[in-house]
């Protein structure tokens, strides 16, 4: 009887470990989510250029039916390695790392009062430095952008 309980407990532990491993394998890491939400390199061509933000936010599952519209989102049109390189830069007083050079990006800002889809955005093309927070040497959050010093 005791052996049966030990075997059952061992089997349950193995199943729990297997499920945890599978969940991690199919789950999205914070870095993967950062890439999905913020990196568009090379810049995606959209037939209606003025609809770039709506198209990309829906395609990248940032906005979706039943979820509130995201007030702002930025797509960086540079290789992911350039944003990873920012993590090796000295952090600022707030703990954010900045890209050493300005890069092309599209800043999307929600227009009107819609808080639920359909979401309508204003797009601005900019050349800005990008501020990120990093974990394990990888960017996981886009904290903001700023214009190069003149």
Which ranges hold each PLM region?
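Acidic, glycine-rich flexible loop segments
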Residues: 94-127
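N-terminal "domain-start" segment
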Residues: 2-99, 110
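Compact beta-sheet-dominated globular domain cores
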Residues: 114-150
């Amino acid at each position: 009887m005791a052996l049966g309980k030990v075997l059952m407990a061992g089997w349950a532990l193995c199943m729990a470990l297997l499920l945890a491993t599978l969940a991690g394998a199919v789950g999205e890491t914070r870095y993967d989510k950062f890439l999905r939400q913020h990196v568009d390199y090379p810049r995606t061509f959209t037939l209606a250029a003025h609809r770039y933000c709506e198209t990309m936010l829906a395609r990248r599952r940032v906005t979706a039916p039943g979820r509130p519209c995201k007030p702002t989102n930025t797509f960086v049109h540079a290789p992911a390695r350039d944003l990873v390189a920012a993590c090796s830069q000295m952090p600022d007083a707030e703990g954010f790392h900045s890209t050493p050079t300005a890069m092309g990006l599209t800043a999307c800002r929600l227009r009107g009062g819609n808080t639920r889809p359909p979401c309508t955005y204003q797009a601005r093309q900019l050349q800005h430095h990008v501020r990120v927070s990093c974990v394990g040497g990888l960017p996981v959050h886009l904290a903001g952008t700023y214009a190069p010093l003149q």
